Amino acid sequence: MDVDTRLLRYFAAVAEEGSLTGAARRLFVSQPALTKQIRRLEDDLGVPLFARSRSGMALTEAGRELAVRVPALLDVWDEAVRATARAARVLRLGFLDAGAVGVVHEVIAEFRQAQPEWRVELRQFDWSDPSAGLAGGEVDAAVVRLPFPGQEALEVRELFVEERGVLLSARHPLANSKTVEFRELWDEPFVAAGAETGAWRDYWLATEEREGHPLRVGAVTNRPDEWLGAVAAGCVALAPASTARFYSHPDVVFRSVRGVSPSRVGLARPRGRKREAALDELLEAIARRLSRS
């Protein structure tokens, strides 16, 4: 029998969290999607793994047996993937948006000249995974925007901060302002990331800076092109200043905002993992360049 390792990761998260809500938040997936995947694993194995009730998810006897073995299985698989990448001399670097990556392409080009035996793969993830692939073990390190759920389990090095401003439709009454007070936006419909992104979503909605004022969500998306389209159609969105340089739309303008904290950009990698000298060299070069940018 072949079982998708992603299903095992989902199972392990629900078993450890004791609820779909906590596991969905940790995995950056929606609760309905997680429920569907757990059902799929149960169908594949032919046994119920959880007893479901209003108070949460309790492991069945079969589920407890699997829960004991899954962490070791996943550890072995993850190490096999890493060993394969090392043997192939591949470094995988995740990112979310071009603005955060900035001059990384130049650093990678220089690294390839200095270390021609290594290949660097840049992998872009959408906003449904603010860890940029680290949560699922899909990358070796990532350029990330802080804060995001699960970052306390990672080794994170903050590199720089940049202004958070607002994206507005060019037809918006505030579009001609050089600077906007955040309170002027409180009643506007905001573009939000999916609820599964937790603290990431809250940060980009500036929920802590609304002084209790209720939030209006006008659109939900995890993709930059849909995000810009929603703004052009009349929603508003907080965004880092670099967005104006790397993403554009003829009907969208970027304006400075007073009353919100800046965006922080960092490098993240798993804790406690065997260090690869080539990866250390690459990340140090990226850190130096981004810190100066």
Residue spans of the language-model regions?
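Short helix-boundary/capping micro-motifs
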Residues: 12-30, 46
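Secondary-structure junction motif
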Residues: 145, 178-182, 188-211, 275-283
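Hydrophobic hinge/microswitch elements
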Residues: 126-131, 135-139, 145, 194-255
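Acidic, Gly/Pro-rich loop/turn segments at junctions of secondary structure
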Residues: 114, 125-187, 245-247
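Central regulatory/effector-binding core of bacterial HTH transcription factors
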Residues: 88-149, 221
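Alpha-helical linker/hinge and terminal dimerization helices associated
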Residues: 44-45, 65-91
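A late-sequence structural motif
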Residues: 103, 245, 253-293
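A short LG(V/I)-centered, amphipathic sequence patch enriched
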Residues: 40-59
